Amino acid sequence: MNLRKFLGGTVLVAFMLFSYSEQNQVNVLCSTDWFMVTVHPFLLNNDVYVHFYEVHLGLGCPPNHVHPHFYQFHYRVTECGIRIKAVSPDVVIYSSEIHYASKGSSTKYVIPVSCAAPRRSPWLTKPYSAKAPSNNMGATPKNDTSYHVFTLPEPSEQPNCSCPPYVYNQKSM
């Protein structure tokens, strides 16, 4: 029984290590406005460390966020020669390349990167009427730039709760 638990634990650890070593070395995110690529320093393999000054996006755009464990390119889709292709009325594909040129040798690589994004942002809602409600609750008084949303209780008023005494600056008895 103990041997079975040991072997099961060993297999689990081996699986976790294998999964960790197979991480994506390049991650791409995009929207209708932004194109973001994250590159890990061991981009090519685990033996070659890629310095941030050896990589660029598209037409020479350097990483604009450099961290010890990743470099990030975050540019508008209209910059760096990023290409745009509409594949349907609802989806657009953005594509570019990560260019690697080693400073210590003549090694060069081009890694294609692409991302699909919806044409319409899921964060934007449909237009709605800006008219105030009929009971005029949302209207502002004349010559006033703000309106009353809620009132805070007076300092002497305390809500009915079982809060600790220090919440209301009272001394405990």
Swiss-Prot record:
Q: State the protein's name.
A: Placenta-specific protein 1
Gene Ontology terms describing biological process: placenta development; spongiotrophoblast layer developmental growth
Described by its record, this protein's role is as follows: May play a role in placental development.
Quick check: keyword Signal in the entry?
yes
Lineage summary: Eukaryota, Metazoa, Chordata, Craniata, Vertebrata
The family annotation for this protein states: Belongs to the PLAC1 family.
Q: Where is the signal peptide?
A: 1-23
Under the heading Gene3D superfamilies, the entry gives: Zona pellucida, ZP-N domain
Which keywords label this protein? Developmental protein, Secreted, Signal
Gene field: Plac1
Query: What are the record's GO terms for cellular component?
Result: extracellular region
Which tissues and organs express this gene's product?
Expressed in placenta.
Question: Record's InterPro entries?
Answer: PLAC1_fam, ZP-N
What superkingdom does the record give? Answer: Eukaryota
Which compartments is it annotated to reside in? Secreted
